[in-house]
Amino acid sequence: MRSWGRDTFISLRGLLLVTGRFPEARDIILGYAATLRHGLIPNLLDGGRSARYNCRDAVWWWLQAIMDYINISEDGDEILQSPVIRLYPSDEAEYTTEVTQPLHEIINEALVTHLNGLKFRERNAGRKIDEHMTDAGFNNVIGVDPETGFVFGGNIHNCGTWMDKMGSSAEAGNKGVPSTPR
């Protein structure tokens, strides 16, 4: 099943929290927490095994959804102690279900990773996961400016924010060119 991290957490407040569907919201928050890798929530979940970590802002939408859950639901702060089975307990780990951590530790990992900066190449980089992206687009360098708190990252060959359309036309000359390169 394909599930989009950014879209999920942008809509979670309106679809689940303000409508009182707290158990569903909790399950989604914790389910995505299990997939954290490189300090990021995947933009494309794809069942957890072929997730794409090509989105700089999905993790921030996830964190906002957690704050909304805490503020809107009764006993919302209890979610911070909820156990999460980590599918990737480290950046280089293969898929596993042997490590369990409370949500608050995973939140901390995401924040510390961003503050320290992260640099990685997407797993399975190439046509198998994106038939239009150039090779350099699979390289990611992301961080947070400690002076401003602004998130930075990406390069002219990838699109890691909400305007993530990758050009696909050789005829038009935009194949492999993001509509909004960073």
Regions found by a protein language model. Give the residues of each.
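Acidic, mature catalytic/reactive cores of soluble proteins
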Residues: 1-182
